[in-house]
Amino acid sequence: MARTLYDKIWDEHVVHTEEDGTAILYIDRHLVHEVTSPQAFEGLREAGRKLWRISSVVATADHNTPTTGWERGYEGIADPTSKEQVTTLDKNIAEFGAAAFFPFLSKRQGIVHVIGPESGATLPGMTVVCGDSHTSTHGAFGALAHGIGTSEVEHVMATQTLLGKKAKNMLVKVEGKLPFGCTAKDIVLAIIGKIGTAGGTGYTIEFAGSAIRDLSMEGRMTVCNMAIEAGARAGLVAVDEKTIGYIKGRPLAPTGVEWDQAVAYWRTLQSDPDAAFDAVVELDATQIQPQVTWGTSPEMVVDINGRVPDPDKEKDASKRSAIERALVYMGLEPNKAMNDIFIDKVFIGSCTNSRIEDMREAAAVVKKLGQKVAKNVKLAMVVPGSGVVKEQAEREGLDVIFKAAGFEWREPGCSMCLAMNADRLEPGERCASTSNRNFEGRQGAGGRTHLVSPAMAAAAAVHGHFVDVRTFA
């Protein structure tokens, strides 16, 4: 029987299935950070349990870590709760162990969904979980990856398994050559704009088509990262030579005979040609334009040359109400041109867009424009996703380009993606952000978030408002 990529990985990891479809699934890799792990470790401690398989755990601190003040060490973490979570992770890993731990201030520390792939901890065919919804990022490697809750974090630590039911299969095919000036971020925002934030609910999405194959591994990670924003629990991209080339030589990747055996298996991780999907969505990549969200949901997105929608033109009452509420929160008027929206801050970073390719993309725009950050922009910050990314960017001189233009070059971490550390928006401030969520209060109470690509964010920083990066790139 022909199987999809999702079918193959699921079948390889099912330990037992009940009559109602509930299955026990074996977990290969458990990524751990400081926010959703303290209660789980405490649960193990109270029950007198140890980690079932220490070699499955890779940990780092990211959500609460500051992006400035590293010279002060742990004293640079201003918020007491944040500091306690970071130090508690240190203590828990010291007690329980891990295959790899990248603590605060270490060279390889960074966002968990950046350090996992770059360290070789994420491998094709794996089941990967983390107490974070954007674990779907790792699906770019042909791994079945999804977020879990805190109680499930403890369950995986104790048993190396999870309970769950198999999702349906969705295929999202993006065919054609992506236009100049458009990126993986524009692809995934266009997908979400088409199917909505509930379009993938109940599905695991496989992203395929020539436009997806043409993306780098970093671009594929951006797409899979936002599968959760399309409603899916997980996103997948089939393994190809790009996948294998990216992994080779990474610190935790297999070597020698084990590498050869792994590669032979990885090359089987593709959907069979005649595999059936429960739903198929198709997009023409040649028609995709730079995307900008205008509202308080990722599905509230339009092309850069578009306009803020008019609720009076929406026939569906619930959708009309959602538009009206979003307009009030975002402080926007119907029919306003997107390129007439001025901004207060710019954030280039997050697990969606903080890898070296993203840094290069943004720096290239800044260098091309040859101008400083606009006077109306209070803060433009660039936050690499890990110490490794930061070091590589500095070797290439990207930090010099950013700083010369008036951007702040920060230390790695989740930063302004979420209001859980010192980097946040004040009420009413408007931000061009390369992150993944534009919910009310996501970047700070009353903050207004517009999701864009790194290139679009860089161009907005210099011009002070949204512009079509294709005009300048």
UniProtKB/Swiss-Prot annotation:
> Which reactions fall under this protein's catalytic activity?
(2R,3S)-3-isopropylmalate = (2S)-2-isopropylmalate
Taken from the UniProt record, the cysteine pairs bridged by disulfide bonds within this chain are none
What Enzyme Commission number(s) does the record list for this chain? 4.2.1.33
**Listed GO MF terms:** 3-isopropylmalate dehydratase activity; 4 iron, 4 sulfur cluster binding; metal ion binding
Pathway the protein contributes to: Amino-acid biosynthesis; L-leucine biosynthesis; L-leucine from 3-methyl-2-oxobutanoate: step 2/4
One GO BP annotation is:
L-leucine biosynthetic process
Describe cofactor binding as the record notes it: Binds 1 [4Fe-4S] cluster per subunit.
Which cofactors? Answer: [4Fe-4S] cluster
> Superkingdom of the source?
Bacteria
**Family annotation (Pfam families):** Aconitase
Keywords of the record, alphabetical order, are:
4Fe-4S, Amino-acid biosynthesis, Branched-chain amino acid biosynthesis, Iron, Iron-sulfur, Leucine biosynthesis, Lyase, Metal-binding
Q: Which positions are annotated as binding [4Fe-4S] cluster? A: 351, 414, 417
**InterPro entries xref list:** 3-IsopropMal_deHydase_lsu, Acnase/IPM_dHydase_lsu_aba_1/3, Acoase/IPM_deHydtase_lsu_aba, Aconitase_4Fe-4S_BS, Aconitase_4Fe-4S_dom, IPM_dehydratase_rel_enz, IPMI_cat
> Subunit structure, briefly?
Heterodimer of LeuC and LeuD.
Q: What does this protein do?
A: Catalyzes the isomerization between 2-isopropylmalate and 3-isopropylmalate, via the formation of 2-isopropylmaleate.
Q: Which family does it belong to?
A: Belongs to the aconitase/IPM isomerase family. LeuC type 1 subfamily.
Its recorded name reads 3-isopropylmalate dehydratase large subunit
Q: Which organism is it from?
A: Variovorax paradoxus (strain S110)
- Name of the gene encoding the protein in the UniProt record: leuC
